[in-house]
Amino acid sequence: MYSILIACLVLLLCLIIYVGHRADHARKYLEGMWHGDPVFLKQSGLQSFYLYIQPDHTCFFSVVNKNGEKLMETKIPCTITNKIYMFFKPIFEFHVVMEDIHSYFPKQFNFLLDSTEGKLILENNHVIYAVLYKDNFATALGKTVKKYIT
């Protein structure tokens, strides 16, 4: 009887550690360079959309329309909290609050991260503001350059 109870407790502890580890991995995966999905860019009339998330969660946005005009090129401190792991899907939801308000984004929105596809969706109340993919090469290059500079 006690062995079954102990086995259940050990299993529960392993599950809690696994979920916590996955959430920490997602937070680290969130950092780096993200670029706009070509289909999303075409549908929204944009030439490019770049987002760089630093380890301290400062976000750099660069958005250019089809005419080559910069709509947004700014550094915005963001508070990224409340990671929610959708247990049966490899999707994490992060709530984002920007310290500065910008005309193209609401002050609060969500990052929906699918780490298996390397996909990040910026949304608020089911309105999609961007669909981005992780640029692993640019992220690795940035980390390498930072390592040699410091």
Curated annotation (Swiss-Prot):
Q: Where in the cell is it found?
A: Virion
Q: Which residues form the signal peptide?
A: 1-23
Q: Which UniProt keywords apply?
A: Signal, Virion
Chief localization: virion
The source's domain of life comes to Viruses
Show the GO cellular component annotation of the record.
virion component
Tell me the protein family, please: Belongs to the asfivirus EP152R family.
Q: How is this protein named in the record?
A: Uncharacterized protein EP152R
- Organism of origin is African swine fever virus (isolate Tick/South Africa/Pretoriuskop Pr4/1996) (ASFV)
